[in-house]
Amino acid sequence: MAHKKAGGSTRNGRDSESKRLGVKRFGGESVLAGNIIVRQRGTKFHAGVNVGVGRDHTLFALTDGKVKFEVKGPNNRKFISIEG
């Protein structure tokens, strides 16, 4: 005869692995062509001059230069471009 009542099971206890999103190179930093500037879900930041967009909306440098963040347009969108 059991002296302790059996405990029920829980349906919790899982968590997904973090995706390491965010800005990888900040304004004024030097980058080489191919360097990842931002990893993001959707287009929180938009691609400006000399910046490419990956399939998962990752922004990366197309040329060597310095990273520049700017807010432009009627909707105040954040653009990232590479200067010089």
Swiss-Prot record:
Cellular component aspect of the GO annotation: cytosolic large ribosomal subunit
Annotated segments matching region Disordered: 1-22
Entry-linked Gene3D superfamilies: 2.40.50.100
InterPro entries assigned to the protein according to its UniProt record, in alphabetical order: Ribosomal_bL27, Ribosomal_bL27_CS
Keyword Ribosomal protein: yes
PROSITE patterns: RIBOSOMAL_L27 (PS00831)
Cross-referenced Pfam families: Ribosomal_L27 (PF01016)
Coiled coil start-end: none
Protein's GO biological process: translation
Entry keywords, A to Z: Ribonucleoprotein, Ribosomal protein
Gene Ontology MF term list: structural constituent of ribosome
NCBIfam families the UniProt entry points to: L27 (TIGR00062)
Family: Belongs to the bacterial ribosomal protein bL27 family.
Name of the protein: Large ribosomal subunit protein bL27
Organism: Shewanella woodyi (strain ATCC 51908 / MS32)
